[in-house]
Amino acid sequence: MDQDVMDFFDFSKEFKREVAPQGYISSDPKMMATDSIDSKVPKREVIGTEYVTEIVAKEKGLLNRTLRDECPQSKRKHTLDDLDTDDEEEETEIRRDDEYYKKYRFNLNRDKNLPIYAKREEILAAINANPVVILKGETGCGKTTQVPQYILDEGYKSGKYCNIVVTQPRRIAAISIANRVCQEREWQQDTVCSYQVGLHRPTSLEDTRLLYCTTGVLLNNLIRNKTLTHYTHIVLDEVHERDQDMDFLLIVVRRLLATNSRHVKIILMSATIDARELSDYFTTTNSIPPVISASHGRKHSIEKFYRDQMGSIKWKEEEDDQLVPQINDHGYRAAVKIIMVIDNMEREGAIHSRMSYDEALRYGAVLIFLPGIYEIDTMAENITLMLENDRNVKVFIVRCFSLMTPENQRDVFHPPPPGFRKIILTTNIAESSITVPDVSYVIDFCLTKVLVTDTATNFSSLRLTWASKANCRQRAGRVGRLRSGRVYRMVNKSFYQREMSEFGIPEMLRLPLQNSVLRAKELEMGSPVEILALALSPPNLSDIQNTILLLKEVGALFLTVDGVYNAMDGDVTYWGTIMSRLPLDPRLSRLIILGYVFNLLEEAIIMAAGLSMRGLYVHEGSSSRSTRAQFDSFWMHYIFADGSGSDLVAIWRVYLTYLNMVEIGHEQESAIRWANRFHVSLRSLKEMHLLVQELRVRCTNLGLIPFSVNPSQIMDDREKSFILKVIIAGAFYPNYFTRSKEMWNEHDRHIYQTISGHDPCRTVYFTNFGPSCMGELYTRRIKDFFHDARIPPENMDVTFQPGSEKVFVTFKQDDCVADSSKLVSVPGRVQSEVYKAVRMRLSCMQRIIRIMRPKQFMNYVQERGIGDVIEGRWIPPTKPLNVELLALPSVFSKTITGLITGIINCGKFYFQPLSLAECIRNMSEIFNAPQQLRKYVVDACDISKGMMVLAKRDSNFQRATVIRPENQSNRQPMFYVRFIDYGDCALLPMQQLRFMSEELIQQYGDLPPRVFECRLALVQPSSMVHGNYSWPTAANDLLQFVAKCGRIDIEVYSLFNNVAAVLIHMRNGTINDKLVAQKLCRRSDEDYMSRKDHDFRLRSQESGRYLSSAERQQINEEYLRSCQLPQDFDLPPPPQDLCGTNVRLKGPYSPLECSMQSIIRVGSSKRVNIDSASVNAVLLDTDPQDHHDHLIVAHATVESPNGQTLTARGTTLMPNVQGYGALMVMLFCPTMQLKCNEEGTSYVSILAGLGCDPVTGEPYYAEHDVLINLDVNILEDDLVLINQIRYYIDSVFFNFKEENYPAVSVNERESIYTQLRSLIKRLLSKDRSYIGKNMSNSDFVWETNPELPMPNEPFGKRAIFPMHSLTELKEDDMGRLMNLRENCSMLHKWRNFEGTLPHMTCKLCNQLLESVPQLRLHLLTILHRDREKQIDFCNQ
């Protein structure tokens, strides 16, 4: 802010030299370490729960001393609200509440039919006599609603003050139960009885005596108050669920109950509870909690059958397979057999029973419990196969899982069609959340999927495991509602009894502990280890240690405690305080924190809320909807992402659309239609809306309030999008992945070879369609494959390669004036249709085509005269091509003079050579002759798409093609046309069109355009200036200005697919260089085919001087002919009844499909997938000419059960900015080492993470160390900028240890905000030169270097982002420079060699060169040209 701060970042100032880490690492062609011995993570020792015994013994000793050392001399009386220790032997003043009880009506008549009523007196007596009571009552016995009322009624009778709180694990339960109690007692809501979920609570709780709340609400209140005495009774319901909130609440309750709140009564309730475990947990020397059981008999009996009791079903799998949690084919078939047995049983029973078979069907629904959606779909397929084999059994299949829409979930409750049996395929959602009355049969595979997190890696995995007996009992309880029922358990009885656990694994033993550790810190009653050791099921000590490392990584904890490093603890940062107060995962809280820093708090809150929601997008299962509907469901993600390549941006835009609809006040039916159209869940959006509101309030309470900026400082959409991606990268470090490119030498060539020279950004291909299939006759049927992807057949060309089994589908570019509202934006150069096509393959859409047999085919084409048959070989019909008439530039022409006649943007404009001016004039005179302009268009229906007409351009009529009709305005027909000989487009009324006479069509119908398409060479749009690979308006305006100047000279760099890459000469250089200098675009490599053509043109122009004019013409015609791609014949296919052979095509594929790699050490050797619901599920190389990896950031990473594969969720594709990944790592890592090459002349790699032990050099958190090999130059200036940004982020939240809140003022925040925007822009908009990858042998090694100067730390050890140190670079050795220049000179000499090249290495770029063509193309890359500049090499 002032000069002193700026001086701090000046590396030219003198530094105090101290010991600091430093070292070298290796690099490879994938920007990361290879899977070498060094890169493999040493196995971290797992430390179990041995630590618990000592801590628990110490705790019990403390509690016993507290009970024993009571002070009998004290005569002080106190009330229940006293926060001091409540000594049981002292007389306690009873607080009365008579006036309150007179204020409200108390009806003491309780429902005596509920089973719990029989235990009423026993329960009340136990509560009066014991501090803790355990109540075990079956679901439906009435414990949740009645027990709190019993307590309140007793208070009313005695006049004693009561304040009861009842916890519920879910929001909806707390709300609905409170409303039900109010209705039962006829109390007005939010008076005697109320609820609190999150921050949603009554304005005042003064009159509330019975509060239903979520577990987290009570937990936060107790941690904040550090006493229970605000309540007289605390009822913890559904204790068996054992989530982390409940387990931590038990710790807090037990601790406070024994210290300062011993007069508060605790009631623990559940349907399936381990009563002995809980009783032991709360047992003290003075008290053992009693256990009371309340159950009710069932009206209808339930029979249970196990696998070994089902004799009629023959099980085929091996005995060992029965022990593995899985469902194999035998299991699915066995379930189908059970359904058939049930049906036969009921048919026979109907003969001897009063209930008819049809009635039995109606009340005989079968509920099948399966572990996941995949198993549900597989089970449905098996049942469908059964129906095909046995027509007598009719079933109505209903799916039920959490991601379905509420409308589809309601199908579960509807009766089946007459004569059908309802089969419900469900996950464990139907265990307790859904009760279906007509279920009489349950088939239980006794399996479930649980989320387990490895705390060392922070990777979560969804593991298939055996359900607990408690789960199975709840599942069995789903039958017998209306009649007797049966339960079929697909395991042996002995296995169920002996091997399956009684209860599930508590969350504290399988999920991340970050929130529990932060709560332990906030509780201030000991270290996290000391607090969590007191849990009902204590976690492993190594899990606590790993969690503390994770919290240090996200900035929630400092590395030190009171300035001293502690592996098991750390002081809480203000970031940690914020994270503990927000009901989110710490990384989502970090997203909000960084959103606040950059004044994009609202956007960050929305994204964080959306990521914490499950089922925002609707998934219906693979066979429940049409193929097109499934595809539309996925494609809506792209619409909302709007070309950002970000699931988070898509969430933000979905929510804004929903919010706008809510504010406008759309009716419910309209909202449902909108949700169905865009395949989003209204229920999830409503929950998300509530969470967004809650987060806003919590952020305000924490002082996180956005400030207003001047209109001139408001971010435009481009900058906001860019800054949001910086925030996302900062929030989810180090969940970074690189979009890996194959870097082997011939990969570029392989891309084009794969698709036979087509444009990879517009082309996909199928395989398995052999040459004998005569594919040209079936092009229309191949186009029909894309119907479900909504790609019209006229928007594609289908071509073939002779002798190949490939089919190429090339999508046409929508030329000009495209209807942008109908387009879906995707990042980079690749057309959206390519994404759609690849998604078709991933969605397993069927691609079967019926063809004729070869002999029949030959007869068919000969009879109809389709093409020619020569020597038994069919030659498809072709259009003659006169290449000499093409306006394309000659291979011998380097510079051409002419006019730019039509401009779409800098990447697409049209050039009319001056040599064709005479031809243009002659044509114009003919077209505008009076006799040619008399053919008026009278009826708009006579105009069709693709028709050639005469259209008015300026004052004359010219040749034009009709692109499409436009919506009629004022009944005036309008048409978009493209002028064939100028390239520009126009929207014209019908009156400005004329039909072409047959004479004109015959003469000019086949004449190629008198212009050719161009694009600027060696440049591409900059992500910093404009997103979605779009050219900025300022760049297009400059091109328009140049075009208006008249004649210009263009230099043809290359010609590919009839598009010329050109450099446009100006007075002071080229427009290409000027746009780069003005930062309106950035330098770019040309792709393989362009460089190949450029090299060919250079050599042709060199040799052309020695050729005659006729020879040059012949060579040029051959060259232009080779540039033309095969044609789409678009022949009518033969009738289906003549086609008797099925061919299954494989694909479509794109040669641009690429994979990802994790950059953290523990994930570097694992395969990486992207979640199938992500907008990046189809991952393509959006800029194939760019040879540098792109960064993808994930919100979360899930590991496969076998540990070999990672799945990235909530992904964002980062901008294609040079060195973006390295810059983000340096910006947001805790610390790093920037390492040099062996000569010390340049920085070559980054090792980032929590750092290492300064004595031993052992990394603190080796699993999450990040290694990046640099491919661009990082300079000292970059480090200065990065340190400044880190300083400013820290300064927003810095507070001294004795302060509760940061001291930064609003004015200072505005100044910081302005500085950060400027610094980020300067850092990311630099045009960095490229460097070759460096190799080293010390991957992931943190080393110490006593010579390394340590920067001064403005915030000392209380910095979340400490300053990075910098190694001073050395000057290049002159001998080494001369060696490199000599190597370059030799490479240039070999460039013109026509023989076999001995293997060479470009020492500048560390690139092995194996052939002369490869050498030539390498010399044209930006990498090599930049490196030549760096060593001042000039080729003579």
UniProtKB/Swiss-Prot annotation:
Residues 337-524 form the Helicase C-terminal domain. Keywords: ATP-binding, Cytoplasm, Developmental protein, Differentiation, Helicase, Hydrolase, Meiosis, Nucleotide-binding, Oogenesis, RNA-mediated gene silencing, Spermatogenesis. GO terms for cellular component: nucleus; P granule. Residues 940-1003 form the Tudor domain. GO terms for biological process: dorsal appendage formation; germarium-derived oocyte fate determination; global gene silencing by mRNA cleavage; heterochromatin formation; intracellular mRNA localization; mitotic chromosome condensation; oocyte karyosome formation; oocyte localization involved in germarium-derived egg chamber formation. ATP binds at G137, E138, T139, G140, C141, G142, K143, T144. Residues 124-291 form the Helicase ATP-binding domain. GO terms for molecular function: ATP binding; ATP hydrolysis activity; RNA binding; RNA helicase activity. It comes from the Eukaryota. It is an enzyme of class 3 (hydrolase). SMART domains: DEXDc, HA2, HELICc, TUDOR. Its EC number is 3.6.4.13. It is found in: Cytoplasm. It catalyses: ATP + H2O = ADP + phosphate + H(+). A motif (DEAH box) lies at residues 237-240. Pfam families: DEAD, HA2_C, Helicase_C, TUDOR. Belongs to the DEAD box helicase family. DEAH subfamily. Probable ATP-binding RNA helicase which plays a central role during spermatogenesis and oogenesis by repressing transposable elements and preventing their mobilization, which is essential for the germline integrity. Acts via the piRNA metabolic process, which mediates the repression of transposable elements during meiosis by forming complexes composed of piRNAs and Piwi and govern the methylation and subsequent repression of transposons. Involved in the repression of LTR retrotransposon copia. This is Probable ATP-dependent RNA helicase spindle-E. The lineage of its organism: Eukaryota, Metazoa, Ecdysozoa, Arthropoda, Hexapoda. The gene is spn-E.
